[in-house]
Amino acid sequence: MNKVILYCRPGFEKECAAEITEKATQHNAFGFARVKENSGYVVFECYQHEDAERLVKTLPFHELIFVRQMFVSGDLLRDLPPEDRITPIVGMLTGAIERAGDLRVEVPDTNESKELMKFCRKFTVPLRAALREHKILLGHEKADRPVLHVLFIAPGCCYVGYSYSNNNSPFYMGIPRLKFPSDAPSRSTLKLEEAFHVFVPADEWDERLGSGMYAVDLGACPGGWTYQLVKRSMMVYAVDNGPMAPSLMDTGQVMHHQADGFRFEPPRNNVYWLVCDMVEKPAKVTSLMSDWLIKGWCRETIFNLKLPMKKRYEEVSQNLALLRERLSENGIHAEVHAKHLYHDREEVTVHVRRFWSAVPGRRDER
């Protein structure tokens, strides 16, 4: 198995390919990316067979921006016989992996693949039974074991392989299944909800997304992101010259400041979260977020960077480098991650968590 299969949003294959090529080189793994426009996936073929498995195991998945999922695979299985599609798949996995903890039969996230989804659901049951019979898959799901992937890109054609549960997306097809809340002011609310799922571990939600916290939402109108904060019982400074949804104002948790988000300063020093989804040039937003973190006006921030039509990976990389450089120059210790979320379109979502050293009177971040 000398290939790494990477899922991405259709239309962002070039960005995904540029990213995996750069990251692989940094990990001394060399190869080339095969890209098919609007396919929703990229195939990175390694020159050395062992490098594909090593990348999937050691290249930190959470550091990848445009990649929704990744797994190591062999050659594409073509023209699977309708009377027995299972045997070639079992043969591909035999000797490559054993005692896996889960099976995902998936398709790329394209309109053309939707018809294949019905087949995948039906096919999963007999395939699972066969893999268990051959001891490739455990008799029960186990979260700390490798995950088997079968990606159908067309009827009778699939990539077969596996990923590691501690270095992959836990979601089917790499997509969190979120339901749009009927009382939310806009669909943009799903961006922030997905960001919480991706960037904040579930066992830390009570501590980092708890009730009673103070938050600031820059460019808040009509309140899609504010809604997520209010829903978690936070007090929110909503900053926007436009109107906020009356349903949010009626909660008593929202203080609406009709002001320019680039000039607003928090009226108190215990703001934990800063969120921002303003339509502005990425460099301008990055600079603003850096200022807030350097001044200690927030502890964590989630913000969106709107992408240009071309050189999108380069634009994101440049802004993240600028952000890290400014924080480092000012002695700020922080974690910085970015992801092209499922609910993002021509934008990337960035998360920064600042850590403080022990300071008298200040609760340390763990």
Curated annotation (Swiss-Prot):
Catalytic residues in the record: 306 (proton acceptor)
Xref: InterPro entries: RlmM_FDX, RlmM_THUMP-like, RNA_MeTrfase_FtsJ_dom, rRNA_MeTrfase_M, SAM-dependent_MTases_sf
Subcellular compartments: Cytoplasm
Keyword rRNA processing in record: yes
GO biological process, one term: rRNA processing
Pfam family, one: RlmM_FDX
Residues the record lists as binding S-adenosyl-L-methionine: 188, 221-224, 240, 260, 277
Main location class: cytoplasm
GO cellular component, one term: cytoplasm
Keyword match Cytoplasm: yes
Function: Catalyzes the 2'-O-methylation at nucleotide C2498 in 23S rRNA.
Self-association and partners: Monomer.
Protein name: Ribosomal RNA large subunit methyltransferase M
Lineage: Bacteria, Pseudomonadati, Pseudomonadota, Gammaproteobacteria, Enterobacterales
Name of the gene this protein is made from: rlmM
